[in-house]
């Protein structure tokens, strides 16, 4: 396991950040948020590897590949949060901290967004802080990986 590697996963439609519903998700692009995570991690000697996919199976494959390789996972599962049991099961096999991340606060939105199938296998969840959540998620990983 690389004690320096953090896998950052972004789910469906996050490639459209900055264009899609900016009143909810803000005007910054996914690339901007990833750069924030990379910079925050680098300041503590960590390396972020990012994957965005609109396909659940790609994210599951990335989680499987991270086993024995990455020290931690940060995941913004987007809409998959609410029904992607395959993500839940894959994350349950990962032996390291998992931080669930959301730009908005799902519990302050529509009722169908109130259930997360990721939360039961996450070490913790950061939600509702917009783009600042990416910095917070990396800081949480730094804390969780500290001896």
PLM feature spans:
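Short acidic/histidine-rich motifs immediately flanking catalytic phosphotransfer sites
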Residues: 66-73
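Short, glycine-/small-residue-rich phosphate/pyrophosphate-handling segment
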Residues: 50, 99, 108-147
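Short Gly/Thr/Asp-enriched flexible loops that form oxyanion-binding sites at enzyme active sites
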Residues: 84-95
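Extreme N-terminal starter segment of soluble prokaryotic enzymes
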Residues: 2-6
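Glycine- and acidic-residue-enriched helix-capping/strand-helix junction motifs
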Residues: 17-32
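Short glycine-rich anion-binding loops that position phosphate/pyrophosphate groups of nucleotides
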Residues: 12-14, 78-81, 104-106
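Short acidic active-site motifs
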Residues: 58-62
């Amino acid at each position: 396991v690389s004690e320096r590697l953090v896998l950052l996963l972004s789910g469906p439609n996050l490639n459209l950040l900055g264009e899609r519903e900016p009143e909810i998700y803000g005007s910054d692009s996914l690339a901007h948020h990833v750069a924030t995570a990379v910079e925050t991690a680098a300041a503590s000697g960590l390396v972020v590897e990012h994957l965005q996919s609109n396909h659940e199976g790609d994210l599951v494959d990335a989680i499987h590949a991270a086993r024995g390789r990455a020290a931690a996972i940060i995941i913004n599962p987007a809409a998959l949060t609410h029904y992607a049991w395959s993500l839940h099961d894959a994350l349950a096999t990962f032996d390291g901290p998992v931080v669930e991340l959301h730009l908005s606060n799902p519990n302050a939105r529509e009722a169908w967004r109130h259930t997360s199938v990721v939360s039961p296998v996450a070490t913790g969840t950061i939600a509702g802080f917009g783009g600042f959540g990416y910095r917070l998620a990396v800081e949480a990983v730094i804390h969780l990986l500290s001896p």
